[in-house]
Amino acid sequence: MQKLVRVLPVLMLTLSPIACAHSADSPATAVSPSATAHPAKVAETKAVLRDLWLGHILSIRNVAVATMDKNASARSAAEAGVVANAEQIARSIEPFYGKAASDKLFTLLAGHYGAIRDHLDATVAGAASRQEAAVKALTANAAEISTFLSGANPNLPKDTLMGLLMAHAAHHLTQFQQLKDGDYVHEAETWTGMKQHIYVVSDALAQALAAQFPSKF
């Protein structure tokens, strides 16, 4: 976990939506969002995806708070929110890639949350070995998501996606520890960075869709 958290400041400084959207050596340079996609539609899509991904981190934070409070009913309700949000995120790609791809993304997001939940429970229990196992599962899942999305869209380089997803995971893990420690000042700072970073992720996805499917924008 410590290694994962240490890479976060570097990733936050180096990653951006533009870097994630495409590189000069990528097939993605064949089409750019500004070439034929309607800017207003791209902006609208960015706003929708930002809202969905913000819901992802907010619903998981709700699970974490309920877990720290040992409130089983609140945790159950929060987890239902996580699932509903994952379904919405998965459905957002269906108009572009079809139902099978949407179902696959939902499965991958479920795997992401499963590893996140395992780490949360291990953090509450103070079980270092379980935390490390959860980090391994998170890393494997991030690789699966990166492979899936980069395979679907050439404007999303796999290595860049992996970096974005691991930075995202590090935010979750840092937040859990801060909540456990009652370090609410630093947790608020983590939340600000977490929100900014998830917007980097969602904006990159929107830009990549506009680049690949300009006629839909």
Question: Positions of the model-derived regions?
Answer:
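Bacterial N-terminal signal peptides that target proteins for export
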Residues: 1-8
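Alpha-helical segments in soluble extracytoplasmic regions
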Residues: 60-150, 194-197, 208
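Intrinsically disordered, low-complexity polar regions and short flexible loop motifs
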Residues: 123, 144, 156, 190, ...
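A cross-kingdom marker for long, charged
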Residues: 186, 190-217
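Long, amphipathic, charge-rich alpha-helical segments that form helical bundles/coiled-coils
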Residues: 55, 104-124, 155-183
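Immediate post-signal-peptide N-terminus of mature secreted/exported proteins
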Residues: 30-80
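Bacterial N-terminal signal peptides
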Residues: 8-17
